[in-house]
Swiss-Prot record:
Higher taxonomy: Viruses, Varidnaviria, Bamfordvirae, Nucleocytoviricota, Pokkesviricetes
Gene name in the database record: OPG064
Family, as annotated: Belongs to the orthopoxvirus OPG064 family.
Keywords from the UniProt entry: Acetylation, Disulfide bond, Early protein
Domain of life per record: Viruses
Role played: Plays a role in intracellular enveloped virus (IEV) transport to the cell surface on microtubules. Together with protein OPG056, forms a complex that interacts with host KLC2 (kinesin light chain isoform 2) to engage the kinesin-1 complex and thereby promote IEV trafficking.
Protein known as: Protein OPG064
Covalent S-S links between cysteines: 496-535
N-acetylmethionine modifications at: 1
Keyword Acetylation: yes
Complex and partners: Interacts with host KLC2; this interaction promotes IEV trafficking by engaging the host kinesin-1 complex. Interacts with protein OPG056.
């Protein structure tokens, strides 16, 4: 349990109405300790500024922009890849950032700064060369474009749009463009020419051709606004738009129809009532299912005919359509119809729209995985919800007032997330708790210290261990005396580094000292310094020609190196996947969407990061919003690596899949020096891996896309292995003390 004793004391002693207010009364040391683990209000008191600068500078965004000094800001954001949380601070200190003349820093900050014409002139003076200017300006934001008079060149526009497609909107509003350029952008990028530069080239045929390319209602409305009214009254244009409305593109033409099609209501048919009040008696029409689907969004225009529409829906068993208009048909909904809507409709309906909140309806909602089950609390007690297997604690619940209505719901939340700083921060500092609810929350947490509320299951889950453990113990790397009596041959290779402090060089030397590695591709390493360059000479290892054996031994090496505090980041295979971040934020995670490479490549020293630098390295590699701990980063590396070697290894394996999986697990444990044997069956994992193998072998792609939850069993296995790793590491450490 997160310790809230000091916060509770401050809350009671100072008669605070909010937990945020109580946080401001904490002693600086206590406050900084909580800030370090991500447990803090949206803003923190100025008195903490110096401590934050010293201990957690990446949290400077918690102060208002005027409080943060430009030097502290620049020093901090220079080291971070993701600076989204500093958006307001970056714009506030725009001039200080531009004056640095640091191109990479300016590029990083451009999306957040409101750039003026004077700023552009300054940038042009600082950076000579068209390519540099185009590159920097490509990161400009729409707010800047709306406020400046600077005219972008066509090349600059293309560069900007290549980076952010939707920047076409402010740019097209900003300046008149050549018609040929507009046509090219339409053909190449599908960008509607909403610019006065196209007006002279428009005719009815061109208007229709452009409308055929429109994919956003806003673009259609804005384009028709610039077209000459005489052309909009052409019959060919009218006929095309009427047919487009019949195809369901109603939002695209609402202003146009009201201005130009008042005399064509019969041609509009059932859709006429959306634009003109009760224009058509729809009881005289043969209404199709497609038409019902189209008008369901606009049912407020058909209230006169709601009984007629409901009769058609029920006669034809159109449950999906009934669900889409549920707020207009409350009087006809029985318990049976509510259950049918819940079970048969493609999209979930809001529980608040179901007029009957019976236990049976609730059970059906639970089975269909509804996220707003909490709304049944208006009729059903929380114990019944839990007994039936409901989880009322979801993202949706934050949008309601239920936490202030039910103390039992807060208690349930604490049982689920009381160990998780991120999730408790959301409820305590970001949700508008009443004073009474805040008091209950703090009392419950303070009176249930330790792990009392999380026994027996939660404490052995990976999310719990990620939040409650803070380190992995590393084995000391043995000293290896440098061998200077090596005879070099023509087959020797040389690597050069800029200093002895180079991270890749330090990793290389440490790797060379670790005994028992099987596949690391360098042996007989020696190095010397020459003209400020570090030259490393080595003999390449002999290749292992059996692919399956190479993969297994390589995983052994990765695990063995991890046991000595050198971790492999498999970003070449998984460029975006960080399951640990989801877990420490209390969110569900799924398998990666894509594996970038289907061949397991050789290992290189620069891919291994020392444990003490791992949090920063992983956070920057994946451009995370905040820096995760070294411990959390290590688990992310192990879980990602194991997943990759299971998936890609099984694709390359010629063994029976079950034998391969068990062998991989055994090797992984041996590499980490863990004396564990996983007792769980792996048949479900094998089924998933075989499907991936079949799909990969039937194509010739160098990568593979994965469907959501396609590897759920495999991920569960990887989680269990990580749990065993953490528990063994901590137990081994205790035993050795």
């Amino acid at each position: 349990m997160i310790s809230v004793t000091d916060i509770r004391r401050a809350f009671l002693d100072n008669e605070c109405h909010t937990i945020t207010k109580a946080f401001g009364y904490l002693h600086e040391d206590k406050a900084i300790a909580l800030i370090k683990i991500g447990f803090h209000p949206t803003y923190i008191p100025k008195v903490l500024y110096n401590n934050v600068v010293e201990f957690v500078p990446e949290k400077l965004y918690l102060f208002k922009p005027r409080t943060v000094s430009p030097l502290d800001l620049i020093s901090t954001i220079t080291k971070l890849k993701n600076v989204d949380k500093f958006a307001a601070h970056i714009n506030y200190h725009k001039n200080s950032i531009l004056i640095t003349g640091d191109k990479s820093l300016i590029v990083k900050c451009m999306p957040y700064m409101i750039i003026s014409d004077d700023d552009i002139r300054f940038i042009r003076e600082q950076f000579v060369g068209t390519n540099s200017i185009e590159y920097i300006l490509s990161f400009i934001n729409k707010e800047s474009v709306y406020r400046m008079s600077y005219q972008f060149s066509e090349n600059e526009i293309v560069t900007i749009i290549n980076r952010d497609h939707f920047m076409y909107e402010p740019i097209y509003e900003h300046q008149v463009l050549d018609s040929d350029f507009l046509k090219t952008m339409l053909d190449r990028y599908g960008i509607v020419p909403i610019n006065s530069g196209i007006i002279d080239d428009l005719c009815p045929e061109a208007i229709i051709e452009i409308l055929m390319a429109v994919v956003r209602p806003r673009d259609a409305i804005r384009f028709l606004d610039i077209v000459n009214k005489n052309q909009l009254t052409e019959n060919s244009v009218k006929n095309y738009i009427i047919n487009d409305i019949r195809r369901g593109k109603i939002d695209y033409y609402i202003p146009y129809v009201e201005d130009f099609l008042e005399d064509r209501t019969e041609d509009l048919g059932i859709y006429a009532n959306i634009f003109f009040e009760d224009a058509i008696d729809i009881t005289k029409l043969d209404i199709t299912k497609t038409e019902l689907e189209h008008i369901s969004k606009y049912m407020n225009y058909y209230t006169t005919y709601i009984d007629h529409i409901v009769n058609i829906i029920l006669q034809n068993n159109y449950i999906d359509i009934l669900a889409s208009i549920i707020d207009y048909v409350q009087d006809v909904l029985t318990e049976e119809l509510c259950i049918r809507i819940v079970c048969e409709s493609t999209n979930p309906v809001p529980v608040t729209s179901l007029p009957i909140h019976s236990t049976l309806v609730m059970v059906m909602c639970i089975q269909m995985k509804y996220v707003d089950i909490v709304e049944f609390l208006d009729e059903i007690d929380i114990d019944t919800l839990i007994e039936k297997g409901a989880d009322p604690i979801t993202e949706y619940t934050f949008t309601t007032r239920w936490y202030n209505k039910h103390n039992d719901l807060i208690t349930l939340y604490i049982k689920k997330y009381g160990f998780c700083p991120m999730m408790m921060k959301r409820l305590m500092f970001e949700y508008p708790l009443t004073k009474e609810a805040s008091d209950h929350l703090l009392k419950t947490m303070d009176e249930n210290r330790g792990a009392i509320m999380f026994f027996p299951r939660t404490i052995y889950t990976l999310p719990y261990l990620l939040c409650c453990n803070y380190k992995l113990i590393q084995k000391p790397i043995p000293f290896k005396e440098e061998n200077r009596n090596i005879e070099y041959k023509k087959t020797n290779r040389v690597l050069c580094f800029d200093s002895l402090e180079n991270a890749a060089f330090k990793s290389l030397i440490k790797i060379d000292s670790i005994p028992g590695l099987k596949t690391y591709n360098m042996k007989d390493i020696t190095y010397e310094k020459s003209n400020d360059i570090i030259c490393v000479r080595f003999i390449p290892q002999d290749s292992i020609h059996n692919e399956e054996r190479r993969i297994k031994l390589q995983l052994f090496d990765i695990a063995r190196l991890a046991s000595y505090g050198l971790y492999y980041i498999p970003s070449r295979y998984l460029s975006l996947w960080t399951p640990v971040v989801n877990m420490i934020e209390g969110r569900e995670y799924t398998n990666p969407q894509k594996i970038e490479c289907l061949v397991i490549l050789d290992l290189f020293s620069e891919e291994f990061i020392e444990y003490q630098n791992l949090g920063n390295a992983v956070s920057n590699k994946y451009e995370l919003e905040y820096t995760i701990s070294n411990y959390q980063a290590a688990i992310n590396c192990l879980m990602s690596t194991l997943l990759i070697y299971l998936v890609l290894g099984s694709i390359r394996s010629i063994s029976r899949t079950e034998d391969f999986v068990l062998s991989i697990l055994n090797i992984f444990y041996k590499g980490l020096k863990i004396n564990e044997l996983l007792s769980e069956p792996v048949s479900g994992v094998c089924i998933e891996l075989d499907k991936i193998k079949d799909r990969a072998s039937s194509g010739d792609s160098s990568f593979i896309f994965l469907k959501k939850n396609e590897l759920s069993k495999t991920l569960s296995l990887c989680e269990k292995v990580c749990v065993e790793t953490i528990l063994d590491n901590n137990q081994s450490f205790k035993s050795s003390k």
